[in-house]
Design a protein with these regions (language model features):
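Gram-negative outer-membrane beta-barrel transporters
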Residues: 584-589, 601-713, 774-778
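Periplasmic plug
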Residues: 12-15, 28, 32-38, 43, ...
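Outer-membrane beta-barrel translocator/receptor signature
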Residues: 100-102, 113-194, 200-206, 341, ...
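C-terminal beta-signal and adjacent terminal beta-strands/loops
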Residues: 622, 631-632, 704-711, 730-779
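Structural signature of Gram-negative outer-membrane beta-barrels, strongest in the C-terminal barrel
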Residues: 399-419, 452, 456-590, 615-617, ...
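Solvent-exposed loop segments that connect transmembrane elements
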Residues: 220-327, 422-455, 494-518, 548-555, ...
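Outer-membrane beta-barrel domain signature, strongest for Gram-negative TonB-dependent receptors
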Residues: 191-403, 410-411, 580
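Face-selective signature of the C-terminal outer-membrane beta-barrel domain
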Residues: 295-301, 305-307, 339-366, 379-499, ...
């Protein structure tokens, strides 16, 4: 029954089958695994992938425009599995629904052979809400919060008898309507989930379920025109850019009206005519210009009044205004809508006490549409179907268990996008009015006359076929020493075509590429029991990381990259099993697909991680984790937004300013060791809980993050922070009331951006104190 296996606060309170297939205590699994039970998720307020950083060592997730579609582990994308089956990859098409899950296991580092090729940082295995066989039960939960947050969930389930067979069901309905701290950004969704378990015969059981999820929101572009002065002092570069509106665009701006500047070697210093005449320079408002000296006013552009290189060479400073963290690059008319259908089925044949045959089946369908009026559009559809068969066997002797099987998987994905460089900085977000000059036609939109084709570009429709064989087992050399091994061989073939919707491509409707990739994965994972409650382990893995492009497309061999891991650790369960602690050190390498260069970005990483849960007394408990890591670029990053220095942004804000490799020389100058920036090297979390008696409990603690550079060029840095959170809970009979607060001290801190793409032009200031009141009635 779901109630029996959900677990409590300690990671050892339930077993995990999210690494080597068979259920084991986390104490005996030779990998870094964080077990999240329903109790722990509620205590820590885990509602999306944005919250995972609070519960894993060294956790940090950049802002992918406000839509947490994919987890981020050890500084890289991570895979998402549902009941052991890999879900569709979607970077930020929708927040992955948590409405269907009971708990989750977070595995740091590449997946072993049983799970297959996924993203390089690690993976999260969702444990679905399971039906109740023992008795009928349910809960009704309502949550209200700051910024008109309203969320409600009805969850019911119980046993039933159908066709003479014992069965059990579970239904969960979740609805949310919420504004946010950020102006013009909402987060509304509905989730409908149902699951059924049935004993079909004495030795055959079925577990099946489905979820429909609909999301309505828009992207959060954060602050644009990023400078160190903006980060440190909230001083924002004020002013519009040259008017490029046109009748053909209906009074707005055509994409061709946005200047393009490619950084060259000379761009590390203030340039000349290419910047002064690009139309990308900011035009400061007249009221601000009046504060300048006559000498500096004379150096502004004589026709447009825009900044010039001469202005800055003479010592001029860009004019700024104070801006709040809630003023972001978002338009009330923007949207980022998505629908998702997920279906799963497990058919299990218990052939004997030592042999089980399992067939797992998954369908995952996603459709999303986005438009942001500053000049970005994206649309995608993705369909995944996979069937996996596993024979699990247990033996006596050296080989104690062996699970072998095969998998066949088909993926279809279509993405349509406007262009790879977005004019993030063109709009003056300090202006309370969104001007026509800051609205750029994009994606499905069309000019009113002339060339009336839509603006989709860099689009693709791909098909991917994967066929795999895998095996995982345990060799038990003694009562103290065991070794887990896993192996996988897989073949993949793909095709890539230009979608018919891409009207400006002469090859639309045609196949433009096809190919294939054969690869293998293996790992050895010895674990030594120093005592029944102390385990030391080593894990060595070589495999393949599969990183699709943003919409899930796999159309190149570059989507497949090698990955490797060496990890060693110690796990203990002490003090009558009231204290669990785990320490791990690791070194790894991974290649991540860059969908702007269609090539791999290589990263080498090493780090140390610690986590502990201690039930000190019946009233007092502690949860703590700590992580430090250091990552280095294997090669210079590819095509992306270029880094600017303080005086440089005002000259190019209205343009598309891009870099490739290190054209400015700033990485070699400021970051000679080639460190992969964009996240703190060190972070820690601590939560203490105390039961006051009479139904009351208080919890709280800090999240500590070290200072770090936002970009590889090290022109932007973020300060260290201490972020406090806490909750007060009251339980009486079937009712639970919890008041939770985050960032209690309203600490100024920021959510960075992926340094591969947009960290030079986008940053998001985190919200000040937020509160939620949660009332749950159980029946």
């Amino acid at each position: 029954s779901a109630a029996a296996v959900s677990g409590g606060l300690l990671p050892t309170s339930r077993s995990s089958d999210s690494v080597f297939g068979s259920a084991k205590s986390v104490l005996d699994i030779p990998r870094s695994v964080t077990v999240l039970t329903p109790e722990l998720m509620q205590k820590l307020g885990v509602r999306s992938f944005d919250d995972i950083a609070r519960v894993i060592p060294g956790g940090e997730r950049p802002n992918f425009y406000g839509v947490p579609g994919t987890p981020f582990i050890r500084g890289d994308f991570a895979g998402t599995f549902f009941n052991g089956m890999q879900r569709a990859f979607q970077r930020n098409e929708m927040p992955t629904s948590f409405g269907s899950l009971e708990g989750m296991d977070v595995v740091r580092g590449p997946a072993p052979g049983t799970f297959g090729a996924t993203q390089g940082g690690g993976y999260i295995n969702f444990l679905p809400k399971s039906p109740y066989y023992d008795k009928f039960r349910g809960s009704l939960r309502t949550t209200i919060g700051t910024y008109d947050y309203f969320n409600t969930q009805l969850d019911v389930g119980g046993p039933l008898l159908a066709f003479g067979r014992p069965m059990a069901y579970r239904i969960s309905l979740t609805s949310q309507n919420a504004d946010s701290y950020y102006k013009n950004v909402q987060n509304n969704y509905i989730s409908i989930y149902g699951a059924l378990k049935a004993r079909l015969t004495r030795d055959v059981s079925l577990y099946t379920g489905a979820e429909f999820y609909s999301y309505r929101s828009n992207e959060n572009g954060g602050w644009n025109r990023v400078t160190q002065d903006l980060i440190s002092n909230g001083n924002y570069l004020v002013g519009e850019v040259a008017d490029r509106t046109s009748a053909a665009a209906g009074g707005y701006v055509l994409p061709s009206g946005v200047p393009f500047i490619g950084f060259g070697a000379s761009s590390a210093t203030i340039g000349g005519a290419q910047f002064d005449n690009s139309g990308g320079a900011i035009i400061p408002p007249a009221s601000y210009v009046a504060t300048l000296s006559p000498q500096l006013r004379a150096l502004l552009h004589p026709t447009t009044g825009a900044y010039t290189s001469a202005f800055f060479n003479a010592g001029g400073k860009a004019l700024t205004t104070k801006i709040g963290g809630n003023q972001v690059n978002a338009d009330p008319g923007d949207f980022a809508n998505a629908q998702n259908f997920l279906y799963f089925a497990d058919l299990v044949n218990t052939r004997s006490a030592s042999s089980t045959l399992k067939n797992q089946f998954l369908i995952d369908y996603i459709k999303s549409d986005k438009i942001s009026s500053y000049g970005y559009a994206f649309a995608m559809e993705q369909f995944i179907i996979e069937d996996k068969v596993t024979l699990e066997q247990r033996f006596k002797g050296l080989l104690t268990s062996l699970s072998s099987g095969g998998s066949v998987r088909y993926s279809w994905a279509k993405q349509l996008q406007d262009f790879s460089s977005e004019p993030f900085s063109r709009r003056d977000i300090s202006n309370p009015r969104i001007t026509a000059n800051s609205i750029i036609l994009t994606g499905p939109q069309r000019p009113a006359f002339g060339d009336t084709r839509n603006f989709w570009a860099q689009s693709s429709a791909t098909e991917l076929y994967q066929l795999a064989l895998f095996s995982v087992g345990e060799l038990k050399f003694s009562e103290s020493l065991s070794t887990y091994f896993s192996a996988r061989v897989e073949g993949a073939s793909f095709t890539n075509a230009i979608p018919m919707e891409h009207e400006r491509n002469a090859r639309r409707g045609q196949r433009v590429a096809k190919g294939g990739k054969n690869y293998y994965m293996f790992s050895l994972n010895p674990v030594y029991k120093l005592s029944p409650n102390v385990s030391a382990y080593v894990s060595a893995l070589h495999g393949t990381a599969l990183t699709p492009s943003q919409g899930g497309n796999v159309g190149s061999e570059a989507n497949f990259g090698e990955t490797g891991l060496i990890e060693g650790g110690l796990k203990v369960s002490l003090l009558d099993n009231s204290l669990f602690a785990a320490l791990a050190v690791y070194e790894g390498r991974r290649q991540r697909f860059n969908n702007f260069t269609n090539a791999q970005d290589g990263v080498r990483s090493k780090g140390l991680e610690f986590e502990a849960t201690w039930l000190a007394t019946k009233q007092l408990s502690f949860l703590a984790n700590f992580g430090v890591k250091e990552s280095h670029l294997v090669r210079m990053p590819g095509f992306r937004f270029g880094a600017t220095q303080e005086y440089y942004m005002p000259l190019v804000a209205g343009a598309l300013f891009t870099d490739g490799g290190d054209a400015t020389g700033l990485i070699r100058k400021n970051n000679p060791e080639g460190r992969f920036e964009g996240a703190p090297q060190g972070s820690a979390n601590l939560i203490a809980s105390y039961n006051l008696g009479n139904g009351f409990e208080i919890s709280g603690g800090p999240r500590i993050r070290g200072s770090y550079y936002l970009n590889h060029e090290r022109t932007l840095s973020l300060p260290s922070t201490v972020i406090w959170g806490g909750s007060v809970t009251y339980r009486r009979g079937p009712i639970q009331v919890m008041l939770e607060a985050t960032n209690i001290s309203s600490e100024d801190y920021f959510i960075g951006s992926d340094p591969i793409f947009a960290s030079n032009t986008v940053i998001t200031k985190a919200p000040p104190i937020e509160a939620k009141l949660n009332v749950t009635y159980k029946f």
